[in-house]
């Protein structure tokens, strides 16, 4: 084996970032951390820097950077501390970097992930919002700059593993030429799968974040509870695998053992199974096309005993319907959907908005802004900003 591969972890203090560093720590001969980034959790970032000794640590603002640098110097750590958006893009596209874990949550991850793509990196994509907001621009940049895109979302990673030869070139060729009839995108149904609909107005952030199977951050936990997460994943799948929404079917699978399936034109259905632990798709993408140990326990099928499937109830999960409508509409609709959802989820977590009001706010924002075709990154960002502003105005009146 040659030199260790150099990696930048964008969003190192989040759930995916922490899991990524866990896998990396098991293979010091294969991977070397070049940079770690965080939004504001400088204490955890300091701990990670002490363990992994990256060349750079990047945090959002100067105040946090000062606190981080003070702590690192006190501990004798020589990691250089940077801050701000330009620094994020710099460590994502640096010539010394071989791969980038793109795990910043939400729209904030768009620019640094795009910087990694434009630098031709191997990009491990955990930020689905990048493709939801700017799928056309992003996939075009991947092709133009020779970047390699590997999915980290457990469902999309499962789909990738079930496709022929595991080739990361479906952005160009699509699925039909590979004999694929459709993708079966599985969803647990979240913590409110069986909750009476009339009770959803009273659920709390704590209940929404208590996912029955997965350990995740707050934002994605709420998205899972509303099934917006599955809606965003539907849009992501269309861009990642160059396919139409008609070829993607969402299936409720409460056990979260089958992470997704691919049906072929000959009637074969291939599925990827495993314990619900994000270290599996992370390890797969890190080492692809090889395999490495992830720290995840073996799946015990005897203990699993049964696997259940059902169709999603769009009356219970209107966010899924909104996402399905947005991907069919195209244009600025997915941008508006994502931006309004981020505002709505933040308000719910702050107890300023009821859980059942999340889809209402999103729908109101999408109705308030005319359809357009944002053909540049600047227009995408403008549409995102407009949707956030409208959402905040509506929220203030509710």
Swiss-Prot record:
UniProt-annotated binding residues for NADPH: 13-16, 40, 127, 129, 217
EC number: 1.1.1.267
Keywords: Isoprene biosynthesis, Manganese, Metal-binding, NADP, Oxidoreductase
Reaction catalyzed: 2-C-methyl-D-erythritol 4-phosphate + NADP(+) = 1-deoxy-D-xylulose 5-phosphate + NADPH + H(+)
Cofactor(s) the record lists: Mg(2+); Mn(2+)
Domain of life: Bacteria
Matches recorded under InterPro entries: DXP_reductoisomerase, DXP_reductoisomerase_C, DXP_reductoisomerase_N, DXPR_C, DXPR_C_sf, NAD(P)-bd_dom_sf
Binding site for 1-deoxy-D-xylulose 5-phosphate: 128, 154-155, 188, 211, 224, 229-230, 233
Pathway assigned to this chain's UniProt record: Isoprenoid biosynthesis; isopentenyl diphosphate biosynthesis via DXP pathway; isopentenyl diphosphate from 1-deoxy-D-xylulose 5-phosphate: step 1/6
A Pfam family the protein falls into: DXP_redisom_C
Listed GO biological process terms: isopentenyl diphosphate biosynthetic process, methylerythritol 4-phosphate pathway involved in terpenoid biosynthetic process
Binding residues for Mn(2+): 153, 155, 233
GO MF annotation terms: 1-deoxy-D-xylulose-5-phosphate reductoisomerase activity; manganese ion binding; NADPH binding
PANTHER family for the chain: 1-DEOXY-D-XYLULOSE 5-PHOSPHATE REDUCTOISOMERASE, 1-DEOXY-D-XYLULOSE 5-PHOSPHATE REDUCTOISOMERASE, CHLOROPLASTIC
NCBIfam families: Dxr, PRK05447.1-1, PRK12464.1
Recorded family membership: Belongs to the DXR family.
Protein name: 1-deoxy-D-xylulose 5-phosphate reductoisomerase
The organism of origin for this protein: Cellvibrio japonicus (strain Ueda107)
């Amino acid at each position: 084996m040659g030199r260790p591969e150099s990696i930048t972890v964008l969003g190192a203090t989040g759930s995916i970032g922490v899991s990524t560093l866990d896998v990396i720590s098991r293979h010091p001969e294969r991977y070397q951390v070049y940079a770690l980034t965080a939004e504001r959790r400088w204490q955890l970032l300091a701990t990670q820097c002490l363990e992994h000794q990256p060349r750079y640590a990047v945090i959002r603002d100067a105040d946090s950077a000062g606190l981080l640098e003070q702590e690192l110097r006190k501990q004798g750590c020589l990691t250089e501390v940077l801050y701000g958006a330009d620094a994020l893009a710099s460590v994502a596209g640096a010539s010394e970097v071989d791969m980038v874990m793109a795990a910043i949550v939400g729209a904030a991850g768009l620019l640094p992930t795009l910087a990694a793509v434009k630098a031709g990196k191997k990009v491990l994509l955990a930020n689905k919002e990048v493709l939801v907001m700017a799928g056309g621009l992003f996939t075009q940049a991947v092709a133009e700059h020779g970047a390699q895109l590997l999915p980290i979302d457990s469902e999309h990673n499962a789909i990738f593993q079930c496709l022929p030869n595991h080739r990361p070139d479906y952005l160009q060729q699509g699925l039909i030429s590979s004999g694929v009839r459709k993708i079966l995108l599985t969803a647990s149904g979240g913590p409110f799968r069986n909750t009476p609909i009339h009770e959803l107005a009273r659920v709390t952030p704590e209940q929404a974040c208590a996912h029955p199977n997965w350990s995740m951050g707050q934002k994605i936990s709420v998205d899972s509870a509303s099934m917006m997460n599955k809606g965003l994943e539907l849009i992501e799948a269309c861009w990642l695998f160059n396919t139409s929404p008609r070829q993607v079917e969402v299936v409720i699978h409460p056990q979260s053992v089958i992470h997704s399936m691919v049906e072929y034109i000959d009637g074969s259905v291939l599925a990827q199974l495993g314990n619900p632990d994000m270290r599996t798709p992370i390890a797969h993408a890190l080492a692809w096309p090889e395999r490495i140990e992830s720290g995840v326990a073996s799946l015990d099928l005897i203990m699993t005993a049964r696997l259940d499937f059902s169709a999603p109830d769009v009356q219970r999960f209107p966010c899924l319907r909104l996402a399905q409508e947005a991907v069919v509409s195209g244009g600025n609709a997915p941008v508006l959907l994502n931006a309004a959802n981020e505002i709505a989820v933040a308000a719910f977590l702050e107890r300023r908005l009821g859980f059942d009001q999340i889809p209402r706010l999103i729908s109101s924002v999408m109705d308030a802004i005319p359809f357009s075709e944002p053909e540049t990154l600047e227009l995408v960002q403008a549409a995102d900003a407009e949707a956030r502003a409208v959402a905040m105005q509506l929220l203030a009146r509710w």
